[in-house]
């Protein structure tokens, strides 16, 4: 039991779980301050604020962090071509350190000793929230109800939560709950649990909320020119209608709209959680998918081959660290600086077509291009001397010849 005047900042979503947690924390003697981040999710923020106050929150912070989310978290991931296990674009993993930053700032402003969240004890988010909070404020204490026996034994299922909510006047959903859980932000939406826990089950068509069905999407593509500077998108132009956006947030929102219209960004995967288990997740990442393809193309066009090989390794490690919750770790800071340095000449424009669930690169140009049209031309010899290739091939063949010479000897001895 906490002292009556202990204050806790709760990462509040407005949903059933965190509403019940808010009331439960008050039962334990805490003074509760609720924080709800507007990170691009579909939410009635005024209603959520009124609900938290009605349930006994001393104060409710609602902060729009969308621009910060794009510039400080999504853009570094775009520069890195970040993908976890080759497919997941890290939408939830990137949002957590952004939210953690504000949880800590509010706790410090309010003099709160505690931070609380509603993440489950089996998932990655508990790790991401807490590592972020501890890194930014080592003295903070975290309350994680879904890891506390006195909480999860009292509420083993949704039925018990509903009964608790009704008893304490917590508004409960009047519409049937979707048979899966969802988490949404500006970058993506995820679906997991429920009927999706069986990896064999096909996701129903009505599951998807952020993108149109690719098979019924428009029959005319949208063509975009995306301009990059130092690996970051700075301008997008729709070549069909001339619409242009330059600010980070407006650019990203516009790409979300275009990708959503054409059903771009869906993926259904089984991934390895940091806590050790495999889980099935379905994700929609519309704008992120367009930017991944466009950035990958301009990077290959402007970056030295050997530097890019090193950078690919850095990107793999960066993606792993972000997924596992180490955004504020020294190793992740180091990687962000290295990746940013690799992007100094990654500038230019990529022309893409967005159509029927796909992103097609149509062309690219850059003032820093390492592509030499004359050098590579089949019609012009240029500065390249074809005869030089003979020595190059002979030197590279030497190792192969020696290896197979030895293999022949070993094989002969084994046959004797």
Curated annotation (Swiss-Prot):
HAMAP family: Arg_succ_synth_type1. One of the enzymes of the urea cycle, the metabolic pathway transforming neurotoxic amonia produced by protein catabolism into inocuous urea in the liver of ureotelic animals. Catalyzes the formation of arginosuccinate from aspartate, citrulline and ATP and together with ASL it is responsible for the biosynthesis of arginine in most body tissues. It catalyses: L-citrulline + L-aspartate + ATP = 2-(N(omega)-L-arginino)succinate + AMP + diphosphate + H(+). Its main location: cytoplasm. The modification Phosphoserine is found at residue 181. NCBIfam families: argG, PRK00509.1. CDD domains: ASS (cd01999). The keyword S-adenosyl-L-methionine does not apply. Homotetramer. One of its GO terms (cellular component) is cytosol. This is Argininosuccinate synthase. Pathway: Amino-acid biosynthesis; L-arginine biosynthesis; L-arginine from L-ornithine and carbamoyl phosphate: step 2/3; Nitrogen metabolism; urea cycle; (N(omega)-L-arginino)succinate from L-aspartate and L-citrulline: step 1/1. Keywords: Amino-acid biosynthesis, Arginine biosynthesis, ATP-binding, Cytoplasm, Ligase, Nucleotide-binding, Phosphoprotein, Urea cycle.
